[in-house]
């Protein structure tokens, strides 16, 4: 009986040691970035905090929708004939020698305005069930080669190879480490919520985000048998969400709001996560789409981090200008100047 406490203590020590040994390290990060992230996590661990990440070009390399569209189009799964009539917004640019692709059509919608093509490239996958789309997403993620596509440069048809998403190993490490330390991880994507959930919440891709924590462009889902309509967002808010039971539902082209791009990302944090508690980390890669949540959400008073994936020199230049402008605006209004503080900036190759 006298040995029992000693044995219990020894077992406890072994258990703690094994937990420490199993703790995730940020091995696929530059050392200065890893140290900054480790310090932020240590300061905010197990206090009910949360982090928010963009997905395309932030959590994985390249873009899910922009590669899934030509992949499914090349397989004959998405065509002009299957496209919902509401998505035929302008005439196709056909010639005697060339029939314009839907991928090219998407590019031309972006030339009109991002506010046109951002929703369109989520809506274009309507008409399929989530189960069907999950199969195509998994096929896309397994590709080891780019997808051929065409687009217009003026009136000239150009060829393009579109890369499928490539998981950032560094980000899967960071997601895991945050969760290990009691910091909830949310995804805030300008892409289709249902499509991104198929990657972010599937354990085989390494992110392990709770399905309900994936927030994106939400489209009404339809039960083909009953005609009933719903969305994951509506179900989650009502406390009646089961991701698996939704897989037989059909994606429709009808948008739910808030729309999760530009200021809508910040609005979605307030709507779906917390109206007052700010995240201790926000990660992004696009100044216009991620800028609002990066500059307005991070709780710098807690040592919170602005995480930037520096994939384009012109975006970095734009972001530096935004830091300066926003810091000056904060100072002018007598607010704490946080816009130019606590930035962790890495290049895609450094976290691949």
Can you say where each PLM-predicted feature lies in the sequence?
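Bacterial N-terminal signal peptides
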Residues: 9-17
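Charged/polar interaction segments and conserved charged motifs
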Residues: 13, 83-102, 333-334, 341-352
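A metal-dependent, Asp-based hydrolase signature
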Residues: 65-67, 72, 78-162
């Amino acid at each position: 009986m006298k040995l029992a406490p000693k044995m219990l203590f020894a077992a406890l020590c072994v258990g703690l040691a094994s937990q420490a040994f199993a703790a995730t390290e940020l091995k696929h990060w530059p050392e200065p970035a890893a140290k900054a992230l480790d310090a932020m996590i240590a300061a905010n661990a197990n206090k009910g905090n949360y982090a928010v990440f963009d997905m395309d070009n932030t959590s994985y390399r390249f873009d899910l929708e922009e590669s899934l569209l030509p992949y499914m189009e090349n397989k004959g799964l998405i065509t002009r004939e299957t496209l919902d009539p509401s998505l035929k917004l302008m005439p196709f640019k056909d010639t005697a020698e060339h029939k314009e692709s839907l991928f090219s059509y998407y590019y031309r919608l972006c030339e009109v305005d991002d506010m046109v093509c951002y929703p369109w490239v989520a809506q274009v996958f309507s008409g399929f069930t989530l189960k069907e789309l999950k199969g195509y997403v998994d096929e896309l993620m397994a590709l080891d080669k780019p997808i051929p596509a065409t687009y217009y440069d003026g009136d000239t048809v150009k060829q393009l190879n579109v890369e499928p998403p490539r998981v950032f190993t560094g980000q899967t490490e960071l997601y895991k480490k945050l969760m290990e330390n009691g910091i909830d991880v949310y995804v805030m994507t300008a892409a289709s919520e249902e499509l991104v959930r198929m990657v972010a919440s599937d354990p085989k891709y390494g992110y392990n985000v709770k399905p309900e924590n994936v927030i994106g462009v939400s489209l009404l889902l339809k039960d083909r048998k009953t005609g009933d309509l719903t969305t994951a967002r509506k179900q989650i808010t009502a406390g009646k969400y089961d991701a698996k039971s939704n897989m037989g539902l059909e994606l429709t082209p009808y948008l739910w709001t808030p729309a999760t791009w530009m200021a809508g990302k910040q609005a979605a944090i307030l709507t779906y996560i917390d109206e007052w508690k700010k995240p201790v980390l926000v990660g992004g890669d696009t100044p216009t789409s991620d800028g609002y949540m990066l500059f307005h959400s991070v709780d710098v008073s807690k040592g919170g981090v602005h995480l930037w994936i520096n994939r384009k020199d012109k975006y970095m230049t734009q972001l530096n200008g935004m830091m300066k402008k926003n810091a000056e605006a904060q100072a002018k209004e007598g607010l704490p100047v946080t816009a130019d503080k606590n930035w962790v900036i890495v290049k895609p190759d450094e976290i691949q």
